[in-house]
Amino acid sequence: MVYFFLYSGFRFNLYTALANKYLMEKKEIRFVVQDLNTYTRLISKGVKLKNILVIRLKNLTRHADIPELFDNIDVLSENMSYKYACKLYWSTIEFLNSLGLKSTDILFCGNGSHVQDLAIKKYQIDIKYETMFSELANIDGKTFFDPVGANCNSLFYKLQEENISELKSSYNYQRLNDWELNYVQNKKNKHIIRQAKRRSLNELLIYYVLTVLEIILLIPSYDSLRVRSGLTKVNVLRRKKYKGNLKKTNNDTKEYCSTNFMFFPLQVTNDAQVLINSDYNNVQALKYYIKMSRSMGLELVVKVHPAERNAEFINKIKEIIQEEDGVYISNRNTFELILGSKCVGVNNSTVGFEAIICGKETFFIGKTFYSKLVDPVWRYYYIYNYLINIDSFTGVTVENNIISKLNDLVKMKEKVIEHGKS
């Protein structure tokens, strides 16, 4: 059996496309959801009701607290309180227990850092099923899949630490160089980042209705958990204020003309990698690179992430920049800024990987495997041997051996385990 856990609608196209691949291989599939919007989307897509399973929030007071959830991404980003993180954790454990899982089953999950992911990993200790986590690769048409987790918690990160030389034997300098030149050119021609979108009035109405139903039916959607946790308020005036603040990022502040600058792209404030894999939040990282750029005799150009929804944070960044000489904020094409810079500084953003591809000196202050991809041999292996050729947003793929490649990742995990024993 192959299970696809959809914690929200984010991986909907990706996982439904993968499910079709497994169906073509005569595999049984089940979708596991925890929100009504995803549930109805699956039905409208023709998925049979028997193939859709719903996680319910249990009031399991007999179970112990999970102290490590205090530092979980869902708690840190205020998707839920610690109390409800514990409830979701044990509800997921109870749900997994009801499935009668076998070692031959495969569970496609989140990025490995969510509350549900931790529960799935914990339950896996006793029931040796396979897991597959996924994350954006920031390369069009490719997705990062990993049987252990994402970024610093991934098998790929472990491969770098183990430095298993035979994995890098396929390195082809010319092929990598040609790919990178083509990649940069394509990005320069059309560099589009999905923008943060505000809900329409109809979407807001549907959102409120579904959230109320989820609360009544004990379906633990992120929206309902935020309400239960007291982390959201119904405030129409705030929506109007938010709209005005967000628009302010559309123009450069304090125009810069020099090419003698360091580029610093900000990550979204609730980015999992910033919250759990860095000692610097966005504001601290900005101050770090202001100091560093000055020590290098460079100006600093900052770009707020296009998907940033925190208006208060945006205004805070602008206040800091307005008070600093030689520091600018820009909304120009990211690749234009990378290519025009002397160097690039990031926390642990994927933009750091893009800067490496562009041949720029790149600095990382957060923990990430992207910093290791300065080595072209590892970069080649990552692009050609590790990433899966399926688009994260659309689920579109141009090859038919997706399942075979995913199976190879599982075999690679076993190889690393054996390598560690030797």
Regions found by a protein language model. Give the residues of each.
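N-terminal subdomain of nucleotide-sugar transferases
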Residues: 1-51
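Active-site and donor-binding regions of nucleotide-sugar-utilizing enzymes
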Residues: 5-18, 39, 60-167, 174, ...
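A donor-sugar binding/catalytic signature common to diverse glycosyltransferases
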Residues: 9, 109-112, 116, 331-376
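Short loop/turn segments at strand-loop or loop-helix junctions that form parts
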Residues: 33-36, 57-58, 135-136, 259-271, ...
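Leloir-type glycosyltransferase catalytic cores
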Residues: 155-207, 373-422
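A nucleotide-sugar donor-handling region in carbohydrate enzymes
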Residues: 158-272
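Active-site donor-nucleotide binding/catalytic segment of nucleotide-sugar enzymes
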Residues: 255-287, 298, 302-308, 407-411
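Catalytic donor nucleotide-activated moiety binding site of glycosyltransferases and closely related
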Residues: 287-328
